[in-house]
């Protein structure tokens, strides 16, 4: 797995922290054995409002109207007893992120849901005197709409989609000589759906519009199936096959060479070892950064 990780890092030419790239690489390799062009569903969640965080953004206002004492109970009493897991059960982490984020202004709330590291963590890791810039927050504030769903989708179409999904899809597919076609990102479709009222887009639930259209083409068992994320068992990897690599390569010397503050890194590694909070994505990002430095 370590060799495959290094190959993936070289394919990007820059530190890229989304571990789903690993799966896309394997899938592209298998697909290329049979075809040279494949269709992918990238853009479906951004265009048709499929992410769970969109639901969170829509109910945040209702949550904020709860009495302050009740929200404090949720944050101070309930959150500590929710055991997070990096082995595939993400709902405790998502509840914590929602409760913490809902106390922030909307732009900072949304940024906190899509970032690996909080501004405070980045400030400690980089040893900065002032908090770092938050591009997601800026995009959210400057979105040309006032409806929360519009703003979230527009923010993702300008950030999460091109800088994340399209980036790893292109890098990993082309690495294996596979060309991807993305019909859900046809500009005519994106523009048409974007002109619909938010209430129409989410009628029937997240991605409800796409599901209704698909009923004419697909069996009900596919149309009604709950959303399944395309995520690897990252926590298990980090505590099994990749554990020696973490131990040997994420060190005071390598992190100093990367410009990171070792006590801040050690704090993340300690959380990872204790297993109380799901910090697998943060550890993965640190490992990818180290491998990028070592292989380029």
Regions found by a protein language model. Name each.
Residues 1-133, 171-217, 273, 277, ...:
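ATP-dependent adenylate-handling active sites, centered on carboxylate activation for C-N bond formation
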Residues 5-13, 35, 130-136, 248-259, ...:
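N-terminus-centric sequence/structural signature that marks the extreme N-terminus
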Residues 19-23, 149, 153, 157, ...:
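Hydrophobic (often cysteine-bearing) scaffold residues that line and stabilize catalytic clefts
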Residues 24-28, 84, 101, 225, ...:
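N-terminal glutamine amidotransferase
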Residues 133-148, 194, 258-276, 296:
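Short amphipathic alpha-helical segments and their helix-coil junctions
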Residues 155-163, 282-295:
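Short, hydrophobic/amphipathic alpha-helical patches that form generic packing surfaces
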Residues 218-273:
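PAPS-dependent sulfotransferase catalytic core
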